[in-house]
Amino acid sequence: MTAAQLFALSPLAALAIGAVIAMLLAPVTKSAAAARIAAATGLAVAALLEILRAGVPPAPIGALFTDDGLARYGTAYAALFGLAALVFLRVAGVAKEAPALVALVALGAASLTGAGHAATLFLGLELISLSLIALFAFPLTGMALEASYKFLVMSGLATSAQLLGVALIYAETGALDFPGWVGHGPLFALGTALLLAGLAFKFSLAPFHMWTPDAFQGAPAGAAALAGVVSKAAVAIAILRLNSEAQLPQPLWSAGLATLGAASVLVGNVLALRQQLLPRMLGYSTIAHSGYIAMILASGAPGTNEAVLFYLGIYAPALTATLCASAMLGPAPMLEDLRGLARKRPLEATSLSVGLLSLAGLPVAGGFVAKLYLFKALVQSESWILLAIAMVGAALGFYYYIRFFTAPFFGHGGIEPAPRHRFDRLLLIFCFGLIMLFGFEPLVLITAVNSALAVR
């Protein structure tokens, strides 16, 4: 193995080493601090290595893994926001094994974003899923165990569908690497449909979304952030790679993505309208955002890769900020609990409101530019029905986001926020800064995305 290949695999190695050390420390230490430091070090080193590799020519690694801009962006993204999730996972008081599982989720996401082969695709997805099952259950409350059990059962079904789909594709094409997936027979079409169903579950697309609101409500907020940010981004990048490298049957693949995306936008936004619990509202909201991303993926418009990566970059700090603020208010704060929060905790109130503003896609916050990318892709592809659904979804989203956006600044009462840690404060400031930076200077993120995509 050459030095270039070792350098290309070094971020994955950092994540794996951090996870293993955290696992070894968990049973022999009295607190989770040592394991948390080990996992955080692995995540930080992986993110730093990917930043240092910016502009370095890709190294040929083999059929299983691809060292290109998509993989590098996805690895840095997973490491950075995995580290963010680890910061406020402590709020829930979860087990000492949790930091190792966070690093494993990031490792699975990094593997998935660079997957060029069915084996790597399966490995990445299952590493994410199995780690999330344990993380969802760790508080050992009724809601957490229910969320974990639902995710376990449905994840098993999705994995079965995915494996059967890959087997049928292999029977038709005789290949497991993505470039070899070329065919037009019925087995290929059925295999593609099953593969899409398996990916749709991991992506929280309707009708495979049922686990998402329960996970956001019952699981630790850090675990919800991993499922809603890191896992979602990895699956989106894997679909981008399938779009570009595999020749999946059309219009089955794009029409399936478009249909699932449209259904997710409508289901997620409509069900979020009636929610009074902040985490559950965010759970339905993330289903809608999965739908928006699926619409971009299905459009096939010029600049699809740029639009998806930009949307993911905007979406991550917004959802992370809202989930962190929610965790600091208690296990499942309601709308009424937010009343008057700005007088007690101005940082939490501001970060929560700005995060919701970005998720709604309103001006000033970065989400506004992300919505412009969405509408541009749908107009360029002349997907007028999808455009109408996206606009209706955005209007519905504005209504329920604005309810939670205004609550901290009006009224009295509410709950007494839990004591906060300095790292929580730093995370909120970091996410707030990213949201405002990408809102006022979106070229910063656009430049980073285009630099990543230039590495082929």
Curated annotation (Swiss-Prot):
InterPro entries linked to this entry: NADH-Q_OxRdtase_suN/2 (IPR010096), ND/Mrp_TM (IPR001750)
Protein name as annotated: NADH-quinone oxidoreductase subunit N
Top-level taxon of origin: Bacteria
Keyword terms, alphabetized: Cell inner membrane, Cell membrane, Membrane, NAD, Quinone, Translocase, Transmembrane, Transmembrane helix, Transport, Ubiquinone
Listed Pfam families: Proton_antipo_M
Taxonomic classification: Bacteria, Pseudomonadati, Pseudomonadota, Alphaproteobacteria, Hyphomicrobiales
Cellular component terms per the entry's GO annotation: plasma membrane
GO BP annotations, alphabetical order: ATP synthesis coupled electron transport
Subcellular location: Cell inner membrane
Family label: Belongs to the complex I subunit 2 family.
GO MF term list: NADH dehydrogenase (ubiquinone) activity; NADH:ubiquinone reductase (non-electrogenic) activity; quinone binding
Organism for this UniProt entry: Rhodopseudomonas palustris (strain BisA53)
Annotated membrane topology: Multi-pass membrane protein
Residue intervals passing through the bilayer: 6-26, 45-65, 75-95, 97-117, 118-138, 151-171, 181-201, 220-240, 252-272, 281-301, 308-328, 355-375, 382-402, 426-446
EC nos: 7.1.1.-
